[in-house]
Amino acid sequence: MLGNHLFFIPVLPLFALFSLILKNSWKDILEKAVDPIAICAYGFTIKMALIAALFNSIFGFLITWVITRYEFKGKKFIDAAVDLPFALPTSVAGLTLATVYGNQGWVGRFLKMGNLQIIYTKFGVLLAMIFVSFPFVIRSLQPVLQGLDHGLEEAAWCLGASSFQTFLRVIFPTLVPALVTGFTLSFSRALGEFGSVVMISSNLPLDDLVTSVLIYQSLEQYDYFGASVIGAVILMIALLIIFLINTAQAFYSRR
């Protein structure tokens, strides 16, 4: 019974969203959905979210490997710091990034000497997405890597496999499902980021405007219909991408 009620928690808002949209004609819906500013925002948001998820997958894997396989001073601090983006409100995360990478920030002032700028650019959007979605890959991989049977590695070594061969043929295939899960979660989180992005990007249409900010701008203009259409489109695109990722993962697992 409880499960049935929990099912409606995500379904009811979606039902309300699509009900609001379908009150209008398909012509009006299509006009809002394929607006040049909206199309540019879809593409830019998805591209940045995919790059952020890929970056997090690579470096998240490396960090997970280090904190799981090695003992060193500061290990517990690093392990705890990984969860920092979970604890910070996104607006605080944006303010932190702006403080560090702004023209007068700790890092930004040195970048300015080389005529480099991060905030109010596309790279700033990417940086914000990476920051807020970084922990997902590490927390997805960590329990799997910690629970890995070391006997499998020892057996591979006894059979003459090198360390690289052992990693490639024994360890990595075991980690792939968790890595894909982390990638998917990281992508989903980056795709919907608003608080930090709105503070660190210029939010210019046809440039570095992401869909979450575009939706907010539409709501500020009392264009609830337009905001709903844009939200529904990016939702369906995200579901399609996640479906394709999960399908590829299932195909890999059956091999």
Swiss-Prot record:
User: What PROSITE patterns does the record point to?
Assistant: ABC_TM1
Major localisation: plastid
Q: What does this protein do?
A: Part of the ABC transporter complex cysAWTP (TC 3.A.1.6.1) involved in sulfate/thiosulfate import. Probably responsible for the translocation of the substrate across the membrane.
**Provenance organism:** Prototheca wickerhamii
The alphabetical list of record keywords is:
Membrane, Plastid, Sulfate transport, Transmembrane, Transmembrane helix, Transport
Q: Which domain of life is it from?
A: Eukaryota
Q: Where are the transmembrane segments?
A: 2-22, 48-68, 77-97, 118-138, 167-187, 195-215, 225-245
Q: Which CDD domains match?
A: TM_PBP2
Q: Where is it localised?
A: Plastid membrane
- In Swiss-Prot or TrEMBL terms, this protein is called Probable sulfate transport system permease protein cysT
What gene is this protein translated from?
cysT
Domain ABC transmembrane type-1 per the UniProt entry, residue ranges: 42-246
> What NCBIfam families does the annotation carry?
3a0106s02, permease_CysT
Q: Return the Gene3D superfamilies for the record.
A: MetI-like (1.10.3720.10)
- Annotated Gene Ontology MF terms? ABC-type sulfate transporter activity
A single Gene Ontology CC annotation of this entry is: plastid membrane
Indicate how the chain sits in the lipid bilayer: Multi-pass membrane protein
Describe the family membership recorded for this protein in Swiss-Prot or TrEMBL.
Answer: Belongs to the binding-protein-dependent transport system permease family. CysTW subfamily.
